[in-house]
Regions:
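Alpha/beta-hydrolase-fold enzymes
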Residues: 201-283
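N-terminal cap/lid segment of alpha/beta-hydrolase-fold proteins
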Residues: 65-106
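N-terminal secretory signal peptides and thylakoid transit peptides that target proteins
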Residues: 22-40
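Short beta-strand/loop motif that positions the catalytic acidic residue
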Residues: 326-328
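Catalytic histidine-centered segment of alpha/beta-hydrolase-like enzymes
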Residues: 357-367
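Conserved alpha/beta-hydrolase
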Residues: 136-152
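Alpha/beta-hydrolase active-site loop
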Residues: 161-180
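The serine-hydrolase catalytic nucleophile loop
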Residues: 121-133
């Protein structure tokens, strides 16, 4: 067991399995998972039943951004952290909106920093902001951002996702952090949540500036959109979906704007438990936010196209020799994504299984999210000096 991980069974019922002790399992139960065609999988995911120096801000002409001045998060503001709204541009000229969290009384020291994003279809006012603020309480500069085309970020049309552009969004956040006078650019890490766990791994594989990465309750969005849950989609079903999505492009071109799917995360009865869990987070006061695609919108119908054609996990072995930590709930329907990623990644790597936790528990359950272990991982990986 690595020295930075707590020994024994930590508080909150978290069970830890190190890379040596963890036994990879591929025969996961399929009970309660969605079955059927790739189109059904796309519907389930793209329309899931849905005193420091001033930081540098960059804007673009691609989208008129309006940042709310109010605290409109789904979590309480911490008295231990300073918060400010910032913007920066990615390599494609899209302006991204973000929340920057800084530990109070930093004494002018250059600090280690973290870029945080996710879940897929969420905004920075939800889970990623909670992670960022909590890690700032532990001494890190942390930035939580809205991906391109969503939330307060720029980009048209709205509510589009892209494996390439979203991977670039992560690196753009690293650009931003590395330009801040209070950040040590040689000590930057990344945290990805849910679908952004897979995107974070893809980004860190190519962006060698990042020194360590955590993927919490990760999805591989390219895999699930292409193959369905538990890889249940046949080649024939995949081809049929691609025909439908390709023809949708003609309709969108004729109309001059993209078609959107139905509202996300609405329940009709009889859904699998993980879909109920999504609803209970995104559609209730617990996690609802009006700017989140998963709470109050839907993706463009053609969003799955690029994910079906561009696998995200191809190069994750190239994260090494930088350390990787995967965190997943014991009872999460999505656990097999992390197991496959763990098998594909090279050392140094570790895998934490959180006892009794579901996929959505790791969005906001403070008694389940292992922040002590996450901070210890980054403390070691980024060689952060003690205060």
């Amino acid at each position: 067991m690595p020295q930075w991980l707590p020994r024994g069974k930590p508080s909150g019922g978290q069970a830890i399995q190190s890379s040596k002790a963890f036994r990879m399992t591929t025969a996961l139960t399929r009970k309660h998972f969605l079955q059927g065609s790739a189109a059904a999988m796309a519907a389930a995911l793209v329309n899931p039943q849905a005193a420091l120096a001033q930081p540098i801000a960059a804007t673009t002409r691609s989208h008129a951004m309006s940042l709310t001045p109010n605290w409109d998060k789904t979590f309480a503001k911490s008295a231990k952290v300073d918060h400010r709204k910032v913007t920066f541009s990615n390599r494609y000229g899209i302006s991204l909106a973000a929340d920057l969290y800084l530990p109070k009384n930093a004494s002018g020291r250059k600090l280690a920093a973290l870029a945080v994003c996710g879940p897929f279809g969420a905004v920075k006012e939800q889970s990623s902001g909670l992670y960022a603020q909590t890690l700032a309480e532990r001494g890190y500069v942390a930035v939580a951002f809205d991906p391109s085309f969503t939330g307060e970020s720029g980009g048209e049309p709205r509510n589009v996702a892209s494996p390439d552009i979203n991977t670039e969004d992560v690196s753009a956040a690293v650009d931003f952090l590395g330009l801040q006078p209070f950040v040590d650019r040689e000590r930057i890490g990344v945290v990805g949540i849910c679908g952004w766990g897979g995107i974070a791994l893809n980004a860190v594989a190519v962006d060698k500036r990042v020194k360590a990465v955590v993927a919490s309750t990760m999805y591989d969005m390219s895999r699930v959109m292409s193959k369905g849950y538990n890889d249940s989609v046949t080649a024939e079903q995949r081809a049929q979906t691609l025909v439908q999505l390709s023809r949708q492009r003609w309709l969108d071109a004729e109309n001059g704007s993209p078609a959107y799917g139905p509202p996300l995360n609405e329940l009709k009865g009889g859904e699998a438990q993980f879909l109920v869990d999504y609803h209970d987070y995104y559609k209730t006061p617990r996690g609802f936010h009006p700017r989140a695609v998963n709470s109050n919108g839907s993706w463009t119908v053609t969003t799955p196209l690029s994910f079906m054609n561009m696998p995200l996990m191809t190069h994750i072995a190239e994260i090494a020799p930088r350390p990787l930590l995967l965190i997943h709930g014991e009872k999460a329907h999505s656990r097999y994504f992390a197991e496959t990623a763990f098998a594909a990644a090279a050392q140094p790597k570790d895998f934490m299984i959180i006892e009794g936790a579901s996929h959505v528990d790791l969005y906001d359950r403070m008694d389940k999210i292992p922040f002590d272990a996450i901070a210890a991982f980054f403390d070691k990986s980024l060689n952060r000096p003690l205060p």
